[in-house]
Amino acid sequence: MSAQLLKLETSPDLADQVYRVLLDAISAGSLKPGQRLTQEELAEQLAVSRQPVTQALKLLKKDGFVQDAPITGGLAGRSRGLQVAPLDAHWIAQVYEVRSALDVLATRLAASRGTVIDPALIANGRAAVKRDDIKAMIDADLAFHTALYRAAGNPLIEQSALLHWHHIRRAMGEALQSSLLREPVWDEHEAIANAVNLGDAALAEQLMQRHCSHSSTNMGAQMDSNAKSVADGKSATPQLRGSQLLR
């Protein structure tokens, strides 16, 4: 006789899809730092029950993307709830210290191994900029750097780097709100790719170091600027379409 297992009340895949939709919204800046999150509103906008939303929010809290909100209301009706966790320039600088070390190493190794970076990676990034599609810009950025990690020939580099990318992509979502920072990113990527394709490891390493330094500085400055304009957590919840779960 087979073992009796409890029925799953909610599909793990659905909770994961909700998690990814919310993470994308946080990364793209649709859900802003300090913004309060309510299960009811999110569930209604995504056309799902509250349970997968609850599970997704628990994961987002564990991963550091959301946190307990300040208590509001009187003693009788006070409510804590959740809010999007804030970002700060000091924190992102620390993340970039780690990312820079990994990216510089990966780039040097990729160039020394005769790697050819697919020009479509650059074209995709520039196309995303033209479409004003922040999510696509972030995805293209990750694809470019992942190509370098894999070309390095050391799987530990990719494994280590990708641990930080969920937080990096969120910081990118903040920084890319400024259109002035978008094209220069891909100019730097293209220069790095050209150096790698030429097999010039020293130049590729130098360009990647400069790229990481620029990214850290620009993101920190943009986050400080954005933080000044963030309300006290009462901003309206953006519209998230249920159809996003089907992509």
Predicted region positions:
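Hydrophobic recognition helices of helix-based DNA-binding modules
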Residues: 22, 64, 106, 110, ...
